[in-house]
Regions:
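N-terminal capping segment at the start of a domain
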Residues: 2-28, 130, 317, 374-378
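Short pre-catalytic strand/loop immediately N-terminal to key active-site residues, enriched for Gly-Thr
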Residues: 130-138, 344-348, 378-379
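Active-site-adjacent substrate-binding region
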Residues: 236-252, 259-261, 308, 318-366
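A non-catalytic alpha/beta surface segment that caps or lines the substrate-entry region
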Residues: 22-70, 74-76, 80, 90
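Active-site metal-coordination/substrate-binding segment of hydrolases
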Residues: 67-164, 189
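His/Asp/Glu-rich mid-to-C-terminal helical/loop segments that flank catalytic regions of hydrolases
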Residues: 157, 232-249, 284-298, 332, ...
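Midchain, well-structured core segments that form catalytic/ion-binding scaffolds
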Residues: 103, 117-120, 126-139, 171-299, ...
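Flexible, glycine/charged-enriched surface loops at secondary-structure junctions
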Residues: 19-20, 48, 161-164, 247-261, ...
Length: 407
């Protein structure tokens, strides 16, 4: 089966995770894809494929004769889609020989346009897969799953020599808990790659340090006509707090620049809540960002009274760069493999995180590879058939390279 054919099957399975669930996985529907993947792995000859009670899929292919002393290499992707935009009833549309211009997305009123996404003309002539404008496409990360599955099928059917190969598919990556219950020992790899990036040719081993902040503002409500020097409007205090933070938002930053991102805000005069994510590649600057937020809270409590603003900060993940630097062969081999299939390698920091960032600190060095997916997490998400084929080839070449390496 071709990569894009698998992909089209996978995206039709609703697998969105949930921020509001404490169960593992956060949504039972993720098992629907997990069970299908196990069935497909069995069908291509990976008889030990299994899914555990927490919805983690594990499988391995034993080394071929003569490659038993090669490193065990793993490939990992996640099954869930983002909960922030619908992933239900995905209706992918294939556009052959894309002209590089506007694409009307079904009857949604949305248009995929180079005016908003200037990379689109570079995809001219390729076969584009888009949404109908009402859902995500699910390329994040079902493109990665399809690429891994196709590569493993080809390794087996073409009798390519290889060291031990380890395959893992995780739940709940989009809500930050994809690595929480990942069993590194059971997975069995010496090194791994997540296949969860953007454009084909992306190779990433630096990611944000990440934290989440929960702000609760406790106001004092009284009749507006009798509120002089008495009322504390929680909504206005919340707005004041936001105004005290640097103007370093996702829309104003790029590359190695970090940010404060207000993701949710709700409330009334009596009580308001705000959710922030805080990101930076530098651990020192990340510490300073937390201090900036704490200082703003302190100033507001001095102004409006102790306990007016409550702030809880929770660390989420760390920059994996320190764990990858001793294993730079992972990056060097990926760069060489990309060049050999005509891709221009783009080694750049991830403005986000992956399961691999967490796994790297759990003893499994795990940089990230592109999947050919663009504009993820919303209705403008799209991939190209050609891009996914290149990403599949990249996985195959990495398997080939490590079949010639010794531990």
């Amino acid at each position: 089966m071709k990569t894009y054919e698998r992909f089209l099957n996978y995206v039709r399975i609703h697998t969105a995770s949930s921020e509001d669930s404490s169960s593992v996985p956060t949504t039972e529907r993720q098992f629907d894809l997990a069970k299908l993947l196990v069935k497909e792995l069995h069908a291509i000859g990976v008889e030990n494929a299994r899914v555990d009670d927490k919805c983690y899929v594990y499988a391995s292919v034993a080394a071929t004769p003569g490659c038993e002393n090669c490193p065990a290499i793993g490939f990992i992707a996640h099954m869930d889609t983002v909960p922030d935009f619908s992933g239900e009833n995905v209706q992918p549309r294939i556009i052959e020989n894309y002209d590089g211009g506007d694409v009307v997305l079904g009857t949604s009123g949305r248009v995929l346009s180079p005016k908003k996404l200037p990379h689109l003309p570079s995809l001219k002539g390729k076969t584009l897969i888009v949404t109908d404008g009402t859902t995500v496409l699910g390329g994040d990360d079902k493109a990665g799953i399809a690429e891994i599955m196709t590569a493993i099928e080809r390794v087996i059917s073409e009798n390519r020599p290889h060291g031990k190969l380890c395959i893992g598919f995780t739940p709940d990556e989009e809500v930050g808990s994809g690595a929480d219950n990942f069993n590194v020992a059971e997975f069995g790899a010496d090194f791994a790659y997540t296949v969860d990036g953007g454009a084909e040719g992306e190779i990433e081993y630096e990611n944000f340090n990440a934290a989440a902040a929960k702000i609760v503002v406790n106001g004092f409500n009284i009749h507006p006509g009798d509120s002089k020097n008495k009322m504390i409007n929680a909504l206005l205090v919340a707005m004041e707090l936001n105004s005290m933070l640097p103007d370093e938002t996702p829309a104003n930053t790029e590359g190695y620049e970090g940010f404060f991102h207000l993701t949710d805000m709700s409330g009334n005069v009596e009580r308001a809540e705000m959710d922030y994510i805080i990101r930076d590649h530098s651990e020192a600057i990340m510490t300073a960002r937390k201090a900036t937020l704490a200082h703003a809270v302190k100033i507001l409590n001095e102004k409006y009274g102790s306990g007016t603003v409550e702030c809880t900060v929770r660390d989420q993940y760390l920059n994996m760069v320190e764990k990858i630097r001793p294993c730079m062969h992972l990056i060097d081999n990926a760069v060489e493999a990309a060049k050999s299939i005509g891709l221009v390698p783009k080694v750049a920091p991830i403005r986000g995180g992956t399961d691999g960032a967490r796994l790297s600190f759990m003893g499994l060095p795990c940089p990230n590879l592109g999947t050919g997916d663009f504009a993820c997490h919303g209705p403008y998400e799209h991939v190209t058939v050609e891009g996914m084929e290149k990403c599949t080839e990249l996985v195959l070449l990495l398997i080939d390279k490590y079949s010639k390496a010794a531990k």
